[in-house]
């Protein structure tokens, strides 16, 4: 009679995902990178703050690069081959995050800038006087 083998980890991580979407939300204060499958189910996410950067360092390009690398590492473990990239926001980390995704070896279907642009909607905040 054979022994039952105890599982380490969950069954949820077993299914391979070949195609997905990476969302990069780059604000002036932080960069958040989220990876989903094509249905929108979140597979992995990371942010500059979650990577250990605090305060003003969260808005730096290096922090965005680190956050993107963390997400890509998780996607490679799941066998991701092709992604679409949606970039949103005016932050300094957007170009660095895209460059990191390009360098990773995952094929890019397309890159789209989905930054919301007002058609003269709400009044913007007043200019800072430093």
Swiss-Prot record:
One of its GO terms (molecular function) is rRNA binding. GO terms for biological process: translation. HAMAP family: Ribosomal_uS11. The keyword Cell inner membrane does not apply. It is found in: Plastid, Chloroplast. Part of the 30S ribosomal subunit. Keywords: Chloroplast, Plastid, Ribonucleoprotein, Ribosomal protein, RNA-binding, rRNA-binding. This is Small ribosomal subunit protein uS11c. Its main location: plastid. Belongs to the universal ribosomal protein uS11 family. InterPro entries: Ribosomal_uS11, Ribosomal_uS11_bac-type, Ribosomal_uS11_CS, Ribosomal_uS11_sf. One of its GO terms (cellular component) is chloroplast.
């Amino acid at each position: 009679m054979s022994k039952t083998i105890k599982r380490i980890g969950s069954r949820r991580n077993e299914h391979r995902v070949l195609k997905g979407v990476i969302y990069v939300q780059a604000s002036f204060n932080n960069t958040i990178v989220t990876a989903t499958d094509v249905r929108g189910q979140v597979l992995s996410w990371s942010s500059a703050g979650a990577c250990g950067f605090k305060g003003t360092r969260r808005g730096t390009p290096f922090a965005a690069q680190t956050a993107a690398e963390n997400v890509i590492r998780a996607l490679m473990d799941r066998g991701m081959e092709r992604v679409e990239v949606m970039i949103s926001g005016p932050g300094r980390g957007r170009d660095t995050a895209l460059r990191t995704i390009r360098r990773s070896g995952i094929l890019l279907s397309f890159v789209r800038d989905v930054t919301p642009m007002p058609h003269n909607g709400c009044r913007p905040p007043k200019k800072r006087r430093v």
